[in-house]
């Protein structure tokens, strides 16, 4: 019975998100333009000396297309404005009256919102990217096990991204303003997860440090698994890190929320 409540929250938020088709179309056009700019830049750099780079050109192109197709799933800046408004306005009191776990409800809503955004954008981007000329197109994974590993890391990455988002909501309950947290944490997360530059292009020492952070457990792993940059024992280690950080983020976020709810004061009248 308890699970049905969260399924209802998930379905409701998903249906709501699927209604924003015009915004999705506008976003798709922007993502195509950005993808082509990045891929053209890769071609220009790789033309001089392909062996000087840590990833093959095709792997970098695949990384770019997968990143853009699933951007809304992993982007750290995809936040739920309704939840932030609940915290700052005091309407969180209504949510606290419901016979549900607040953390689980917010987690369900946030995950559903990400999935609905991706559902509108991913397929068109993937289809068009696969039909482009060689060197600019998205190619399939090297084999079936790699594809299934990609799906597994995608699920774990999405769960980690949502847990990180929940951490921002919970910390906002302590500060009453998300502006500072968003400016610091979201910029840091976007850089350290490989959202600006893929982690293989980082200096070796910095890359190894970044790969151990919770940020790398989001989009970095599935993108690099798909492009063939992570395989074998490295892939197993990466999946283990994803599971580890998921537990840390969820348990830590839930504990922080419990502590925050003990001190909640609803102001206004």
Language-model features, listed with the residues they occupy:
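Hydrophobic transmembrane alpha-helices and immediately adjacent juxtamembrane helices
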Residues: 1-269
């Amino acid at each position: 019975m308890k699970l049905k409540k969260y399924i209802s929250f998930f379905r409701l938020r998903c249906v709501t998100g699927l209604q924003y088709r015009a915004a999705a179309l506008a976003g798709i056009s922007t993502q195509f333009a950005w993808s082509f700019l990045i891929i053209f830049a890769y071609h220009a750099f790789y033309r001089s000396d392909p062996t000087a780079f840590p990833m093959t050109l095709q792997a970098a192109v695949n990384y770019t297309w997968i990143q853009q197709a699933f951007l809304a799933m992993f982007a750290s800046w995809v936040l739920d404005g309704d939840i932030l408004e609940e915290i700052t306005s005091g309407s969180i009191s209504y949510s606290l009256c419901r016979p549900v776990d607040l953390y689980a409800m917010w987690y369900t809503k946030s995950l559903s919102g990400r999935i609905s955004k991706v559902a509108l954008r991913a397929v068109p981007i993937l289809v068009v990217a696969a039909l482009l000329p060689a060197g600019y197109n998205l190619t399939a994974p090297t084999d079936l096990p790699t594809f299934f590993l990609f799906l597994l890391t995608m699920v774990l990455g999405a769960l980690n991204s949502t847990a990180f988002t929940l951490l921002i909501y919970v910390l906002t309950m302590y500060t009453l303003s998300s502006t500072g947290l968003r400016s610091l944490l979201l910029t840091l997360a976007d850089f350290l997860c490989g959202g600006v530059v893929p982690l293989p292009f980082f200096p070796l020492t910095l890359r190894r440090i970044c790969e151990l952070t919770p940020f790398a457990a989001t989009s970095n792993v599935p993108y690099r698994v798909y492009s063939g940059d992570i395989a074998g024992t490295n892939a197993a280690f990466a999946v283990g890190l994803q599971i580890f950080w998921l537990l840390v983020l969820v348990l830590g976020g839930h504990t922080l929320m419990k502590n925050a709810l003990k001190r909640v004061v609803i102001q206004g009248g």
